[in-house]
Swiss-Prot record:
<keyword id="KW-0969">Cilium</keyword>
<dbReference type="GO" id="GO:0036126">
    <property type="term" value="C:sperm flagellum"/>
</dbReference>
<keyword id="KW-0963">Cytoplasm</keyword>
<dbReference type="InterPro" id="IPR039986">
    <property type="entry name" value="CFAP210"/>
</dbReference>
<keyword id="KW-0206">Cytoskeleton</keyword>
<dbReference type="GO" id="GO:0030317">
    <property type="term" value="P:flagellated sperm motility"/>
</dbReference>
<dbReference type="GO" id="GO:0160112">
    <property type="term" value="C:axonemal B tubule inner sheath"/>
</dbReference>
<comment type="subunit">
    <text>Microtubule inner protein component of sperm flagellar doublet microtubules.</text>
</comment>
<keyword id="KW-0282">Flagellum</keyword>
<keyword id="KW-0966">Cell projection</keyword>
<comment type="function">
    <text>Microtubule inner protein (MIP) part of the dynein-decorated doublet microtubules (DMTs) in cilia axoneme, which is required for motile cilia beating.</text>
</comment>
<feature type="region of interest" description="Disordered">
    <location>
        <begin position="216"/>
        <end position="238"/>
    </location>
</feature>
<dbReference type="InterPro" id="IPR043597">
    <property type="entry name" value="TPH_dom"/>
</dbReference>
<dbReference type="Pfam" id="PF13868">
    <property type="entry name" value="TPH"/>
</dbReference>
<feature type="coiled-coil region">
    <location>
        <begin position="460"/>
        <end position="488"/>
    </location>
</feature>
<feature type="coiled-coil region">
    <location>
        <begin position="186"/>
        <end position="307"/>
    </location>
</feature>
<feature type="coiled-coil region">
    <location>
        <begin position="348"/>
        <end position="409"/>
    </location>
</feature>
């Protein structure tokens, strides 16, 4: 068998054919060179042998689409590579349509760049010219705005007054030298002086009313700012109280949720314990039923044993009767043997043999029947016990699976609760962080607003100081220019240069734009000193002042 298995053909022949004698000799080398293609314990009669050409045809048929697709991809790749090489070769040619088009585009691009450069130069020159115009306009506007300020206007009024006074004194001197006792001229001059004094007084009162109105407006604005600050503080306090209330409500809600979760957990635990208790009760009932079934089985087996014992006793009785009958027949036959002839002895022996064979047959059938019944009972008992064991095992598996499912559900429930708690803690932390950030942001905004207000005040003070310096420089130049001609009429200019309404000599009010009151004060608080006038002046200088045209 081993020799025939070694001589089996592997390719191109049916199972059972042998190779040539020259190939059979090298069986060991074949085993080394050609490893077995079939698994062990395979019936070679059930194996289909395919010729090499057919196998190759099948492989070609299966791989045809792949080869065709590979060929198509290779052709497309070769065409694409050739196209790219062609494009690379003719890329810099100038005698092609594409080359000429490229040259035209480059020339057009160059012309556009030159035109754009010229336009940029023109735009730059235009921008420089416009910037100069804007700068000049801004300087003119600043100068006009400077001339339109109240102090400059007052200074110009004082300048005009000094020039008027200078001109008036010149005219007075001229008239005095020409007509010294012209009462009509004096009356007219007096009227003019009174009229001028009234006009100046009205202007001064008007300026004073305007300044009072401006001061009231400033006080009103200060009061509005203070009220706005009070409202803002109240709003912030209200926001803080609202945040505290929201936090308290959130904590109450979280406590309620925790209480609800605890109640749900207690309820779930109670249901689980009830379920386990019911399960134990069911298990006890099932165990009781199992015990009842086992008791029934034991009773059945006991009854079956009793029946078997009764059958054995009956069989023993039957055997005893048969032995007794056999003995009786034997005695009867022995008596007949004494009486009959030899042929009769043969007939009797044959009958005895037949009777014994029949009895043995009946006994054998009976034994087989008893054995079959016992075997059936044993098989039934084994099946019942096996079913019971399988049911018990299945019940234990189901109980274990149910317990695992309950434990898994409990674990999932706790994980879910833990996740919900983490999520709630995270939300609470986020809300708390948001509140903290909002409070910090409000503080930062308030601090920024205060800093901005301080910066604004500093910038305002710096601007006021710069404007004051500019005004003082301008006034000094004008006063020096006017003092070159005469020093007699520069007092209105000096008075207009002084700070405060009316050129007061009181303390400087920084919060009121550097105003100086016209009354005497004790300190920088600006409290006016009491005024005591025990007696009036002995001589009234107002008449002389009005006659001379003074307005202060």
């Amino acid at each position: 068998m081993d020799t025939s298995s070694e001589m089996l053909v592997r390719f191109g022949r049916r199972c059972g054919r042998a190779k040539e004698s020259t190939e059979i000799r090298n069986s060991e080398e074949d085993q080394v060179l050609y490893l077995p293609l079939l698994p062990s314990k395979v019936d070679l009669q059930q194996v289909t042998i395919i010729p090499h050409d057919e196998w190759k045809r099948i492989q070609d048929s299966l791989d045809r689409l792949t080869r065709e697709a590979a060929c198509l991809r290779a052709e497309r790749k070769a065409k694409k590579e050739m196209h790219l090489r062609s494009q690379e070769v003719v890329k810099h040619w100038t005698n092609t349509y594409a080359g000429m088009k490229e040259q035209k585009l480059e020339a057009k691009k160059k012309r556009d760049e030159e035109i754009e450069a010229e336009r940029q130069i023109l735009d730059l020159e235009e921008e420089i010219y416009k910037q100069g115009k804007r700068k000049k306009a801004i300087e003119n506007a600043k100068q006009y705005q400077f001339y339109q300020t109240e102090r400059v206007k007052n200074f110009h009024s004082g300048l005009l007054l000094s020039r008027v006074m200078k001109e008036r004194d010149a005219q007075i001197e001229f008239r005095k030298s020409k007509i010294k006792s012209d009462k009509k001229w004096e009356e007219q001059l007096k009227l003019n002086i009174e009229k001028a004094f009234k006009e100046e007084q009205e202007k001064a009162e008007k300026r004073h009313r305007e300044r009072v109105a401006l001061a009231k407006d400033h006080l009103k604005q200060i009061k509005e700012h203070e009220e706005e600050e009070e409202r803002r503080k109240k709003y912030e306090e209200k926001d803080a109280e609202e945040i505290k209330r929201q936090n308290a409500l959130y904590e109450i809600e979280m406590r309620k949720k925790l209480e609800k979760k605890r109640e749900e957990m207690h309820e779930s635990r109670r249901r689980f314990l009830e379920h386990m208790q019911d399960k134990h009760i069911i298990k006890a009932v099932e165990q009781q039923q199992q015990e009842e079934e086992d008791e029934k089985m034991r009773k059945f087996i006991k009854a079956k044993k009793r029946l078997i014992q009764m059958g054995k006793e009956k069989e023993a009785e039957t055997h005893r009767l048969m032995e007794k009958r056999r003995e009786r027949i034997h005695n009867f036959l022995s008596e007949l043997l004494k009486e009959k002839l030899d042929n009769e002895d043969m007939i009797i022996a044959r009958d005895i043999a037949e009777a014994e064979a029949e009895w043995e047959k009946r006994e054998r059938e009976k034994d087989e029947k008893n054995k079959a019944e016992l075997k059936t009972i044993a098989e039934y008992r084994a099946i019942v016990m096996k079913n019971k064991e399988e049911e018990e095992r299945q019940r234990k598996i189901e109980a274990k699976e149910q317990l695992l499912a309950v434990m898994k559900a409990d674990q999932i429930f706790w994980e879910h609760e833990k996740e919900k708690k983490c999520k709630a803690d995270k939300e609470h932390q986020e809300v708390q962080d948001a509140h903290i950030q909002q409070m910090a942001k409000n503080k930062f905004n308030a601090k920024q607003a205060k800093q901005a207000e301080l910066d604004y005040c500093r910038l305002t003070e710096a601007l006021v100081a710069e404007k004051e310096k500019e005004f003082q420089d301008y006034a000094r130049e004008v006063i020096e220019l006017e003092s070159e001609t005469t020093n007699k009429y520069i007092y209105p200019l000096v008075k207009a240069v002084q700070e405060g309404p009316g050129g007061g000599r009181g303390p400087v009010f920084v919060d009121r734009g550097g105003l100086r009151p016209s009354y005497q004060a004790n300190d920088v608080t600006g409290v006016q000193l009491p005024f005591y006038n025990s007696q009036g002046p002995k001589y009234n200088f107002q008449k002389s002042k009005r006659r001379l045209g003074f307005t202060w």
